[in-house]
UniProtKB/Swiss-Prot annotation:
Its EC number is 2.1.1.190. Residues 12-70 form the TRAM domain. Belongs to the class I-like SAM-binding methyltransferase superfamily. RNA M5U methyltransferase family. RlmD subfamily. This is 23S rRNA (uracil(1939)-C(5))-methyltransferase RlmD. Pfam families: TRAM (PF01938), tRNA_U5-meth_tr (PF05958). Signal peptide: none annotated. Keywords: 4Fe-4S, Iron, Iron-sulfur, Metal-binding, Methyltransferase, rRNA processing, S-adenosyl-L-methionine, Transferase. GO terms for molecular function: 4 iron, 4 sulfur cluster binding; iron ion binding; RNA binding; rRNA (uridine-C5-)-methyltransferase activity. [4Fe-4S] cluster binds at residues 83, 89, 92, 171. It catalyses: uridine(1939) in 23S rRNA + S-adenosyl-L-methionine = 5-methyluridine(1939) in 23S rRNA + S-adenosyl-L-homocysteine + H(+). The active site is at 406 (nucleophile).
Amino acid sequence: MAQFFKAKPNSSKQLSAKLSLNVDQLDHLGAGIAQYQGKVVFIPGALPDETVTVQLTEQKKNYARAKLIKVDAQSPERVEPECPHYHTCGGCDLQHMSLSGQREHKEAALLDIMAKFAGTEGGALSPALTGEGWHYRRRARLATLFDKNTKHLSLGFRAASSSNVVPISQCQVLAKPLSDLIVPFAKLLNQLSAKASLGHLELIAADNGHFAVLRITKALNDKDLAKLSAFAEQHQIYICLQDNEGQFQGVGVELVLPVYQLLDENAQSDAVSLSFTPGNFVQVNSQINKAMVAQAMDWLAPAPDERILDLFCGMGNFSLPLAKMGADVIGVEGVAEMVSQARVNAKANNLDKLTFYHGDLSADLSLEPWMGKIDKLLLDPARAGAFESLQWLKKMKPRKVLYVSCNPASLARDSAVLLERGYRLQRLGLIDMFPQTHHIEAMALFELTK
C-alpha cells in the first residue's frame, strides 16, 4: 500500500508569529481569553474588550497560551500598575485592572463556578467584603537567593511560575512599615558572614509590634547576632531565628509572639485576640479578617449554649469569637501545633466553653470523641476543601452550615454535597482578601430544609 507524506504545520513558525486578537473575557485565574482558529487562547495581562498583539507560547489540541506583546485598543478598566516590580515579580497579577473591575470579575467568576458545578444559578450575591486595595498585607515571606559568583544575596519574591528570585525595593500590597524594611533588611543580610546559609525572611505587622523571622540553616556567630540585635533596636522590630528543626529563638530579647485582634472591644463585649507562632497560618489581611469574622457571627447567629463545631479551626480565628458569644464550641484542626496554640488563646481570652481536638479531617471520623449531633457547623478548610468531612453530615445533623472558602472550585464541589443532603444555599458573598491578585475567597451559608 502506498503511503503519502502529509506535511505537519511548522509549530515553531506558529509560535513565533505575532497575532492580533480580540479579548472576550477573563478566566478564573485572571488571564484574558480570546479565540484563534477554533481554540481558546489564554493571555495573561489582557483584559476583556481589548484588541491585543500577542505571540503564542504554547499550542495544545483545544487551547493555546500567548504572551501579551502590545495592547492596541485598551479596556476602560485598564490602569497603570503602581508597583515598579509588577511585570517581573510573581506576587500580584491584576494590578493592570481597576479595583472595581477586579471585584466585578471575581463576583462573576464566583457565580459562574457555583452555577456550573453546584447548580446554584440565578442567585444573588450578598455585598462583598472589601477593604483597602494597597498596603493591606500584614504578613509576607520574602525569598533569598545567594549568588556564589558575586557573593551577593538577593531578597524579594519569586517570579511567576519560576524559582528565580526577583529583588524588590518595595511592595505595594505589604503594610507600609514592612515594605519600608525591605531595602534595610537586604543591606543587613548582605553584611552577615553567614549570608550563604540564610533562608527566607518573614515580615509580620501585629497589634503588639513588628516582627521578622529569619530562617537559618546553621547557627550564627556572635558578630552576626550583634548586627541583627542592633538592627532590631534601631528599627523597633522583634527579630527571631528559625533553625532546621523549626525551633525559634529571639535575638537580643526573649521570644515574643505576635498578637492579632479578631473582634474589637465595644460596649457589649471585650476584645478577642489571637496570638500565634511565626510560621503558623493566619489571615494576612487584618481589615478583611475582622469583617469576615463579624459577618460569620452575623450569618451563623450563635446563641448561648448552642453546640457549634468548627472544623479546620486553626488557632481559633472563628472558635474564639463563637465562644465569646456564649456558644459551646468544639474546634478540630489537623496541625497539632496550632491546636496547642488555640488552647493558649482560649485561656488568654478567659474563654472556657471551648474544647479543641487534633485530628485528620480527611479520615474516618465516626469514632472521634467530638462526633455527634450539633446545632451548627463552621468550615474553614484549605484549598482542597472539606469533601471528606461532609460525608459525616448525617451524624452531625447541623441546622446551619457556614462555609468559608479560599477556593471557589472546592466550594462548588462541596456545595453540591450539601445540596444533595437537603441543605439550601441561603447566602453567598465574595471576600476580597487579596486585592491586585486573581485569588477569590467566599462565604456561603446553608440551612437544612428536609
